[in-house]
């Protein structure tokens, strides 16, 4: 490799590449979440018949993974570059390899492997066929073909490509610690994020108010239900995300037992399923506006039979 791309140049390169493939460039969704998959730009849009092609960076919070800024590769918050394409292009893997070339990684000069790793997210009732992508022995990307989202079968199938930006940048810049990644010219990743990493880790493991979090979970769950009773999908899903993050904080604090853990996950999953069903019904009521006219008319006629 010649010039080593900065973190933000990696993002810009991926944005330009997937823009050229017809993806809309979305912005990170303004609610805490554990993965880019949980953004409504993936979770909601992966279900139903309408096409959807989008790419976005998603800061992803995982309280239990915090290490006070002392671990070079494990983080409370990391960044994913998320690509979702529905229906899935037949050449999605070739497009992915081409995107690596744009980053200066020649597939012919490196050991790139697709290792089977089927994906499941119990808290949202989602699952799919998947592969980890290993670059010279290090996982840098997760590939998934969604089979089920929010408890609903997907059709057409959505392809998801999730780049782990910190791992990718560490490889490209040849650094051993995420904190040594150059975010922009002259500015290191650690200069931006090491203090937040320490503080969020301390909060998640030592300081968070368990009683408050338990109460908040119940309140968020109730409010999601109220929004759904009014047919308000997006506010309801915001509260599902709040439930998920609150549970993750409780889990990091060790505030829930193994039995209770399963119960909380089931409560989140039940809400997510109702959100998914309500969203599909809403899109049908609106007449599937993202479908081309011929397909839209045909599908609405079939639904009316």
UniProtKB/Swiss-Prot annotation:
One of its GO terms (molecular function) is ATP binding. Keywords: Aminoacyl-tRNA synthetase, ATP-binding, Cytoplasm, Ligase, Nucleotide-binding, Protein biosynthesis. It is found in: Cytoplasm. One of its GO terms (biological process) is glycyl-tRNA aminoacylation. The keyword Aminoacyl-tRNA synthetase applies. It catalyses: tRNA(Gly) + glycine + ATP = glycyl-tRNA(Gly) + AMP + diphosphate. It comes from the Bacteria. Its EC number is 6.1.1.14. One of its GO terms (cellular component) is cytosol. PANTHER family: GLYCINE--TRNA LIGASE, CHLOROPLASTIC_MITOCHONDRIAL 2, GLYCYL-TRNA SYNTHETASE. Tetramer of two alpha and two beta subunits. NCBIfam families: glyQ, PRK09348.1. HAMAP family: Gly_tRNA_synth_alpha. Belongs to the class-II aminoacyl-tRNA synthetase family. This is Glycine--tRNA ligase alpha subunit. It comes from Streptococcus pneumoniae (strain 70585).
